[in-house]
Amino acid sequence: MTVNEIAQDLVALCKTGDFETPGQKYWADDVVSVEAGGPPGMDPVSRGKAAAAAKGEWWAGAHTINSTSVDGPWVNGDQFTVRFHMDVTVKESGQRQVMDEIALYTIKNGKIAEERFFYGA
C-alpha cells in the first residue's frame, strides 16, 4: 500500500471510532510511539507493538470518549498527519476535558515505523 492509502484507511477507521485496528493493521513490529507527555508512571516513548498497544489500552481504560472528530490526512513523502479532537471524561476524577491532538506518522516498508503525538499548548 502507498502512504496515501495507509493514511486514508487509518483516518476512515478512526472516524468510525475504531482506534485499535489501525495499530494492529499498520504498526511495524518495532514501531516507536512518542507522546508529548507520558501517561502517569509510564514512559512517553513506547517501543514495539506490545508496548504501543498497552499504552492504548491504558488510555482507553482511563477515559470515556464523549465525542470525537478526525481530520486529514495530510501526506508528505513517507509521512502524514492527522488531527484528533476529542471530548473525554477522565474516569478516575470524572473531569471532562477537550483534547486537540496532531499525530505525525512515518511509514517504512508499508508499516507505521513511528508515530508522534503533539498537543495544543
Model-derived features with residue positions:
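Short acidic-aromatic low-complexity motifs
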Residues: 1-30
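A solvent-exposed, acidic/Ser-Thr-rich amphipathic alpha-helical stretch
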Residues: 20, 24-73, 77
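Short beta-strand edge/turn micro-motifs at domain boundaries
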Residues: 100-121
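Hydrophobic/aromatic beta-strand elements that line small-molecule binding cavities or substrate pockets
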Residues: 67-74, 86, 100-106
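Generic short beta-strand segments
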Residues: 83-89
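Short loop/turn motifs at secondary-structure junctions and domain boundaries
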Residues: 64, 95-97
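Residue-level signal for well-ordered, solvent-exposed loop/turn and beta-edge residues enriched
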Residues: 32, 95, 111-113
